[in-house]
From Swiss-Prot:
Primary localization: membrane
Keywords for this protein: ATP-binding, Cell inner membrane, Cell membrane, Kinase, Membrane, Nucleotide-binding, Transferase, Transmembrane, Transmembrane helix, Ubiquinone biosynthesis
Enzyme class: transferase
Pfam families (UniProt xref): ABC1 (PF03109)
GO MF annotation, one: ATP binding
Protein name from the UniProt record: Probable protein kinase UbiB
Pathway: Cofactor biosynthesis; ubiquinone biosynthesis [regulation]
């Protein structure tokens, strides 16, 4: 770690302690060396004991800046992990940052273009149209044809700042994994890795441009969705240039009503667009919050959505799509055993799961929903409750399904905001039933069999030998499996503990050295170094032996 990273880590830890985030970890889970580190080097008191945990976490992330704010926003959509109260607190985080200097923006744009701005654009506006934590947007007109465009440029040094904070998040997640154990429901390392994938995708504007081009082509003749044109020859990793659109923010219901927009049709089209993207195209916009969705000012009786910011897109495998569609249909048929079987067949939960227990857990969660009329049942909350239940049965995190659930919640919330009487089931059921018929109908099955026949014919003679070899391998494997697994887990536990002690000792020694160089008070400085050396010795002695497992 560089000195800059250590200073950032120190600031993150101080902020977390200032808001009492360490108090949220049960004391029985915190080892003695964590408490020693906390009270020997950080003597801060929790200044926010009067606030609930979710609010404290929100305030800490707000203070830590854009990368943590976006992480909090992502966590707010993970209601399979967090309670509704915590999720609602984090949802209030706002990605608002002041714009950076227009001279820096100009220089960055010219670096990407490898030419002066005036070579490509007229009327470049130095005042940004919008500014966020990752990028900034300016308007201009194309010199070649006079078209109105917007230029989206990454903030200076944003990549280095993001990667530095991601490193700290990963280390914090590993520490929490050590405290909480391998069977914890939160799985912080997986959550941080999911966030890493998302935010690193947002750092590649060329990928956003390619996503937008693909989505635009999928709906090129649609009367429901319009994606602005991307000038691909002017799109790079740190800069993209696209058509400028004129629309009404979808959240501005007053303006939509004022122009006579058919809100019922607009809400229904939003649901249809979601299912079309997921099941027809297998490529869906996964960041459809109101800031990225506009409505055309033309043809209010035949409303047209305009979609922006295609940095985060989702895809599903054919199996995922089929299991998802069957899940929804099984839910509305109140076939809870089929839901349990689908989760096992799909591999989302272990094949060793007790089907009867899983079925009962699903029934307990889902059956009360039918006390409401069908048009009041939320698809997103059905999926959310099923995920929450499955996590109790050790469901493996499926990032693509998390994106889908988040998007579905956005779409539903948006649809019911536009038209409170929206009946999602009535809109979606015909689509799902038609798609299922197309996937599992006799013609489709016959076509799949015909496609596979040459392969099966070629490999059929090998089948008896393969069966025998697999049975023999299974017998041999079962003899050693339990012993190997036990030894491996013990080895990993020792390695995690040793690594944590060694990393903590290094941080303590370096921080103590920095404090001495800054003429800080001697006792915490030398105390930090002494504690660091002691922890290093413990970590070195507790490391696992270098031998085969």
């Amino acid at each position: 770690m560089t000195a800059k990273n250590i200073r950032r880590a120190y600031h993150v830890i101080r902020t977390a302690l200032h808001y009492g985030l360490d108090d949220l970890i049960p004391s029985k889970l915190t080892p003695w060396y964590f408490k020693l580190f906390r009270y020997s080097f950080f003597w801060l008191r929790n200044q926010h004991k009067d606030k609930v945990g979710g609010e404290r976490l929100k305030l800490a992330m707000q203070e830590l800046g854009p990368v943590y704010i976006k992480f909090g926003q992502m966590l707010s959509t993970r209601r399979d992990l967090l309670s509704d109260e915590w999720a609602e607190e984090l949802a209030m985080l706002q990605d608002r940052v002041p714009p950076f200097d227009s001279a820096i923006a100009r220089a960055s744009i010219e670096t990407e273009l490898n030419a002066p701005i005036e070579s490509y654009f007229n009327d470049f506006d130095d005042i940004p149209l919008a500014s966020a934590s990752i990028s900034q947007v300016h308007t201009a007109t194309l010199k070649s044809n006079g078209a109105a465009v917007v230029l989206k440029i990454l903030r200076p040094d944003v990549e280095q700042k993001v990667h530095a904070d991601l490193l700290l998040m990963s280390q914090a997640a590993d520490f929490l994994e050590t405290l909480l154990g391998t069977n914890n429901r939160l799985r912080p390392a997986e959550v941080v890795e999911d966030y890493r994938t998302t935010i690193e995708g947002e750092l590649n504007l060329k990928l956003e441009a390619l996503n937008a081009i693909k989505l635009r082509n999928n709906f090129i003749d649609s009367n429901a969705l319009y994606i602005p044109y991307m000038y691909e020859e002017l799109c790079f990793t740190r800069l993209i240039v696209m058509e400028r659109i004129d629309g009404i923010p979808v959240s501005d219901k007053v303006a939509l009503e004022a122009q006579g927009t058919n809100l019922k049709l607009l809400a229904e089209r939003g649901v249809e667009l979601f299912f079309t993207q997921v099941f027809r195209d297998n490529f869906f916009h996964a960041d459809m919050h109101p800031g990225n969705i506009f409505v055309s000012r033309e043809h209010p009786n035949d409303p047209l959505y305009i979609g922006l910011d295609c940095g985060i897109m989702g895809t599903l495998t054919e199996e995922d799509k089929r299991y998802l569609a069957e899940n929804f249909l099984a839910f509305f048929n109140r076939d809870y055993r089929r839901i349990a079987q689908l989760y096992i067949e799909s591999g989302w939960v272990s094949p060793d799961t007790d089907v009867a227990a899983f079925e009962q857990a699903v029934k307990v969660v889902c059956e009360p929903m039918f006390n409401k009329p069908l048009d009041e049942i939320s698809f997103g909350h059905v999926l959310l409750e099923l995920f929450r239940t499955a996590r109790r049965f050790d469901m493996v995190v499926q990032p693509q399904l998390v994106l889908l659930e988040k998007t579905l919640l956005y779409i539903e919330g948006l649809g019911r905001q536009l038209y409170p009487q929206l009946d999602l089931w009535q809109t979606a059921k015909p689509f799902l039933e038609q798609w299922m018929a197309e996937q599992v109908g006799p013609k489709v099955m016959a076509a799949k069999v015909k496609q596979k026949l040459p392969y099966w014919a070629e490999h059929l003679p090998e089948l008896p030998e393969l069966i025998y070899d697999n049975l023999k391998m299974g017998r041999n494997l079962s003899k050693n499996q339990n012993n190997l697994l036990d030894r491996y887990l013990k080895h990993q536990q020792k390695a995690h503990k040793s690594n944590y002690l060694l990393i903590t000792s290094a941080i303590l020694v370096i921080c103590g050295t920095i404090l001495i160089n800054q003429d800080a008070t001697l006792w915490p400085s030398y105390g930090s170094i002494g504690t660091g050396i002691a922890l290093w010795v413990l970590g070195w002695r507790s490391r696992p032996k270098n031998r085969k497992i």
